[in-house]
Amino acid sequence: MKSMIRNASVAAAALALGLSASATVRADDKPTLAFVVNGASDFWKAAEAGVKKAQGELPDYNLELKYPEQSSVAIQQRLMDDLVTAGVKGIMVSAVDPKTSTDGLNKIASETALFTTDSDAPQTKRVAYIGSSNVDAGKQAAEIAKKAMPDGGKCLGFVGLLGADNAKERIQGMKDGLAGSKIELVDVRGDDIDQARAKKNVEDALVASPDITCMVGFYSYNTPRIYEALRDAGKLGSITVVGFDDDPITLGGVKEGTVAATVVQQPFEWAYQGMKLMASYLKGDKSGIPEKGLIIIPTKIIGKDDVDAYAANLKAMQGK
C-alpha cells in the first residue's frame, strides 16, 4: 500500500483532477462533494474519470476524490473529519472496515450527507449505497471456476481486507455458487492492501499448498499479484486463475488465457452517478433514493472473447 501511494501515476492523476489525501476545500461559494476511497489503487482511476465527467455536468459544485494516506480505519476517519471541518456538504465513501466504523460513520452522517459505495455500511445512518452486489459478483466468480474446472478442484482466495463487507460478501457469494459442485474454496488470505504482502501470500501458498489448483483474486490488485507470482514460479497456465476487476495485468492475462476470466465492476458509474445523486439529494430531490437505499450497478464477466472490446471501452472512459 505504501509503495502504491507513492506511485507516480496515481499522484499525477490526483494533481490533474484536484485529488489528494488532504481535506482542503476550494475557497469559493460552491458546495463541495467528496468521493473518499479506501486506499490507493489503480482500481479507482475509473472513479476519477467518473468524478471528472460529473463535474462537467455539475458546474454549481466542486467535486473531489480523496485518497487516504494509508488503508486504515483511523486515517480514513480523520480524512472525513477534516473534510467535514472544511465544509464539505456530502461524502461518498468506500469504508475500509464498515463493521468497526459504525460510530465514526454515524458521526459523519450527523454532520453531512453520507453515502457509501463499493463496501456498504447498512447499519449506519448513510443515505444510500451505490455499487455492486458483491454476493452476485462472488457467484459470478464461481461460474468462472466451474466453467474452467469441470472436473473440480481446490481454490485458494486472496483479498485485501478480510473484515470488509465487500470481501465477506464476495467470498460468501462464491461459496454459495460453488455449492453442490466439485470445487471448494478452502481458504482466503488477507493482506491489508499491502502489495508486497499480497504477492508473498501467493508465493507462500505455492510452497505450502501444492494441492491447490485454482487461485482467486478478490480485490483488484490481487489477480495481478497472483499472475506475477505464478509467472515467477513458472506455473502460469497450470493453476486456474479467477479474477476480479480490470487491472491491465488481469485483462492481459484474460487475453492470453492465463486468467480464466474476471468479474468487473463499474467504479466509473459509481462515481458519476453517485456524485449526481448527492447533488440532487442536497437540492431536496430524494426521488433517486430507493426505499431500501440500495442502488446496484451490475457486475459482469469478461472472458477472452470480449476482453479487447472491454479494454478499449475502459480506455475511452478514462480519456486515454
Where are these regions (language model features)?
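C-terminal segment of classical bacterial N-terminal signal peptides
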Residues: A16-V25
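Bacterial N-terminal signal peptides that target proteins for export
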Residues: M1-A12, A21
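A residue-level marker of the well-folded mature domains of exported/periplasmic proteins
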Residues: S3-R6, R26-K320
